[in-house]
Swiss-Prot record:
Cited InterPro entries: Cytidylyl_trans, Nucleotide-diphossugar_trans
Cellular component per GO, a single term: cytosol
Name of the protein this chain belongs to: Spore coat polysaccharide biosynthesis protein SpsF
Natural source organism: Bacillus subtilis (strain 168)
Pathway annotation from the record: Spore coat biogenesis; spore coat polysaccharide biosynthesis
Matches recorded under Pfam families: CTP_transf_3
């Protein structure tokens, strides 16, 4: 398990909420809170610093790279649209066997859930592992690095599979050892979203974070409890 790599996919160029990954949340930035939380995982290795930020090579992300360097985060840059290629570039440079894919607009990824998911991935010898029925934005995905390299080499790979890194695996589960875990009971609240896509999401998350005392270490289960006390919260998922 020494060659695990956490990869946080982040960029400044969101169409609905530009610059969201560096927006303030309490006294910190969204990205900084996420990095802090991931570093609480039992699988984070401080001596190796097995966490990187993968951003684009667009000029608009120069400010993000500068922020990462200032904060001491390892940062890699690659294609903005061909995100799979960006990940492969990181994999070829660092050479992990397993990656944990995270996105910079999910500041409340829970380290306990990360540990459950990663351990299950190894225990079951899976190719891909994901947690079901948790709030959107608190998990991430575990995937064997060689799979992403293999997928990137598929002839005439559709654009959607370049943009969405693990979508090919999810759309072709018969080809891989895919594991979908049920969220532990205290995290089981699929009706909520703890991700930031829009200005409304951001304002809702800010309000929730304030209620939680603006603590970077707050458990996702505690946030769920706060949301349960306010069933009309704007962070509820819209019905399909």
């Amino acid at each position: 398990m020494n060659d695990i790599l956490f990869i946080i996919q982040a960029r400044m160029g969101s169409t609905r909420l530009p610059g969201k990954v560096l927006r303030p949340l309490g006294s910190n930035r969204l990205l900084d809170i996420l990095v802090h939380r991931v570093r609480q995982s039992a699988f984070y290795q401080k001596d190796r610093d097995n966490l990187v930020i993968a951003t684009s090579d667009k000029e608009t992300d120069d400010i993000l790279e500068a922020h990462c360097i200032k904060q001491g985060f390892r940062v890699f840059r690659g294609s903005e649209e061909r995100v799979l290629d960006r990940f492969v570039k990181v994999i070829e440079a660092v050479k992990p066997s397993v990656i944990i894919r995270l996105t910079g607009d999910n500041p409340f990824v829970d380290p306990e859930l990360l540990d459950v998911m990663i351990q299950a991935h190894f225990d079951q010898g899976s190719d891909y592992t994901y947690i079901l029925n948790a709030p959107l934005g608190i998990c991430g995905e575990v995937v064997n690095a060689n799979l992403l390299i293999d997928i990137s080499r598929i002839q005439a790979l559709e654009d959607q599979y370049q943009e969405h890194v693990t979508l090919y695996i999810r759309n072709h589960p018969a080809l891989y050892r895919v594991q979908f875990l049920e969220a532990p009971e205290r995290f089981r609240a699929p009706q909520y979203r703890l991700t930031i896509d829009t200005k409304e999401d951001y304002e809702s998350i800010k309000a929730l974070y304030q209620k939680a005392g603006e603590r970077p270490d707050v458990s996702a289960s505690e946030l769920i409890t706060l949301l349960n006390r306010n069933p009309d919260a704007a962070t509820e998922r819209e019905a399909d």
